[in-house]
Amino acid sequence: MDGDRDAPNLPGGETNSVARGAAGDGLGAGDVAVSTDRMHPDVGRRHRSWKWVPVACVVVLLIAGGWYRTDYVGMFPGSAAGLDHLVEVNGQTPAEEPGEGDIHFLTVTVGSRMNFYEYLLAKLDDDVEIVDESVFTGGGTRDAARQRNFAAMDASEQQAAATALDYLGAPSIGASVLVVIGGTPAENNLHVNDLITAVNGVAVASSSDAVKQVQQSVPGDEIELAVDRDGEAQVITITAADNGEGRALIGVQLVTRYEEQVGIKIDGVGGPSAGMAMTLEFIDALTPGDMTNGLEIAVTGEILPDGTAGPVGGVPQKAIAARRADVDLMLVPEANLDDALTTAGDLKVVAITDVQSALDAIGEAGGNIQGLKGSLAD
């Protein structure tokens, strides 16, 4: 009898060959192909799964790029802030008249350390300067750098007040301690804001008077200081150190204090770069009329003890802030002029060297500067 007829008749020609194999007949090449495909259905799927490996790698790299922080931060344009409503004279804010102009100080914003994508975007933005974070931190923490900047702002305010009052010829009352230098004889003896009124029994009315008297001594001498500390009179004796050149050193930076008291309430801003702006605002606030004559004037630059304008950082970003604020004039230290011109556009920028050159620039732009110098002298 024919074996083919003994096999059950299954539907479909392909499965007939499998049935024959099960009954003991030899399998042909076609039979093997059919039965192998049905016994291992995941072979093709395993092959296709390898296609996802490159995609997974890309996803991992994208996540890593967003997570990884570089050593760089972005310096962005900040603001141009008017000082009129922030200044105080003898504890009072001077009244503003309609139409008065203003002196604006300029800021920059420093971001946190950038990730890879932020870094790439900053590279494409002409308004942003990329710098190593250590430029701001000095290798320390951001919090420590922030505290140093706030201290620098306070010192700058006092120097600006002294410079303005000196320019106006106001009567002075002594030498105020601006900075106490660590590791010097003054460190454990004098405090910031101590008012020195006499040195070795000689009355002093200014910082220069005090320095001259100290320099009459030699290293190793005892120097007697008459000090007003928070309204309490004290006599403090300090043994002078050597400044490295054979001259007496006590270890303080001094600033002249005046009968008139001026200050500015600025919160959350650090660094010394508003010094020249504060100096000009103090001069305006202490004298009659509107020095700006309705002009909006942006100013940047450190104010140094001799009244000169010290260079500052971030000037391209500050020029952008001034331009966006639509001010009439921007004053910058001479050393920063080229930096300002790179981003100032149509804004008029004038280089200054000291207080007088800044006032001259304001006068040439239409301000009222006549009769200011020495106007508070007795």
Predicted features, each with a name:
Residues 212-254, 341-377:
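PDZ-domain C-terminal substructure recognizer with occasional recognition of PDZ-binding tails
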